[in-house]
A protein has these predicted regions:
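Membrane-proximal helix-turn-helix segments that form the acceptor-binding/catalytic region
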Residues: 54, 81, 109-129, 229
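Aromatic "clamp/platform" in nucleotide-sugar-dependent glycosyltransferases that forms part
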Residues: 239
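Short hydrophobic beta-strand element within catalytic cores of glycosyltransferases
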Residues: 256-259
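A short, active-site helix/loop in glycosyltransferases that binds the activated sugar's phosphate group
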Residues: 120-150, 159, 163
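A charged, aromatic-enriched C-terminal amphipathic alpha-helix characteristic of glycosyltransferases
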Residues: 20, 280, 293-324
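Conserved acidic donor-binding segment of nucleotide-sugar-dependent glycosyltransferases
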Residues: 271-283, 290-294
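Conserved donor-binding/catalytic core segment of Leloir-type glycosyltransferases
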Residues: 159, 178-195, 201-204, 208
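A short helix/loop element that forms part of the nucleotide-sugar donor recognition site in Leloir-type
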Residues: 165-178
Length: 325
């Protein structure tokens, strides 16, 4: 049995709002019989946090950092001398740096470039390097890819089926104290212009007055399943994404999903009857959504795609890697 230390700079803030992926990953690993103990240590930008990580690392068999960038490189350097297998999983912009396209200041652009360069350097230093989608490999310099390809693995993100359980749309709307109606969920947790809320609003406007846009922003992670259950469909209009987990979360709750072509959205929706890629033209997108929503729901993706959605199943493949090294 392996003990695993998870580290990331992505975590909910003091109000419980933010990226919950690491806590959900921790809980899913804790349920696995091949894992003796798991601890997630969030990284904060201070020396105390670095000291805590190094001190804690001695007590675990595997150290696995999620999300690359300068912070991950610094942690790897801080952990020099600790003879434990070191894993890192990159999640998107830490490799492809597509957010450069929308960066509004020179300082932010330099930060994005620095984090990308630090990620490339980290590939040399870690024992195994994971990527949440295969298309991220296209952004790695050829000399690095060729030399270190043997370290690479794909770690698809997943959904905690114990947390994401289906309830009726009406009950979910009542739980959120929303008026009964037809809602299109739009996830914009960080209130970022990259998510293109303006495009989502334009699409919904062309769908007619019977649909309302439900914006999920500043929501605690425990409320996310309720928001999805309360909706009729989920919409993604971002300019940039890596491997958006909101797609998996919606499919795990049997919700139709409509996304512009971004990240690996097309791959996630491939072969589905009730979900599809839509145009960035609001009128064309609205027409596609109308067409698909008029169909009978037949996908039942929670069951059909459980092998690629359920954290409990996905983690088995990661634990295989832990045991091989």
């Amino acid at each position: 049995m392996k003990s695993v230390l998870l580290i990331s700079n992505q975590h909910p803030n003091e109000n419980g709002i933010g990226n919950p992926i690491m806590y959900r990953m921790e809980q899913a690993l804790l349920r696995n019989k091949r894992v003796s103990k798991v601890k997630f240590v969030p990284f904060f930008n201070n020396l105390k946090s670095l000291w805590q990580i190094r001190h804690t690392a001695h007590d675990y068999d595997i150290i696995h950092i999620h999300f690359g960038g300068l912070y991950a490189l610094i942690i790897r350097i801080i952990l020099i001398g600790i003879a434990k297998p070191m894993f890192i999983t990159f999640h998107g912009t830490d490799i492809h740096a597509k957010s450069l396209q929308s960066a509004k200041s020179r300082l932010l652009r330099w930060k994005i470039i620095l984090n990308q360069k630090a990620s490339f350097m980290s590939i040399r230093l870690f024992d195994r390097c994971g990527f949440v989608s295969e298309n991220m490999l296209d952004y790695i310099p050829q000399n690095i890819k060729k030399k270190y390809y043997h370290k690479f693995f794909i770690q698809s993100l997943g959904v905690d089926y114990n947390t994401f359980t289906i309830s009726s749309k009406e009950k979910a709307q009542d739980d959120l104290h929303f008026p009964r109606g037809k809602y299109i969920l739009f996830s914009d947790v960080s209130n970022s212009s990259i998510k293109r809320r303006d495009l989502a609003e334009a699409i919904v406007a062309h769908l007619g007055t019977h649909y309302k846009l439900l914006v999920m922003c500043g929501v605690k992670p425990c409320d996310v399943p309720t928001y999805i259950n309360a909706s009729d469909l989920v919409l993604l209009t971002s300019d940039e994404e890596g491997s958006p987990n909101i797609i998996r979360e919606a499919l795990a709750l049997n919700k139709p999903f409509f996304s512009v072509k971004v990240g690996d959205a097309a791959k996630q929706l491939e072969g589905l009857e009730n979900s599809t890629i839509i145009s960035r033209n609001p009128i064309e997108a609205a027409n596609t959504i109308k067409e698909y929503m008029s169909k009978e729901y037949v996908d039942f993706t929670r069951t059909k795609l459980q092998d690629v959605l359920d954290f409990n199943i996905i983690n088995e493949r990661i634990i295989d890697l832990y045991e091989q090294i």
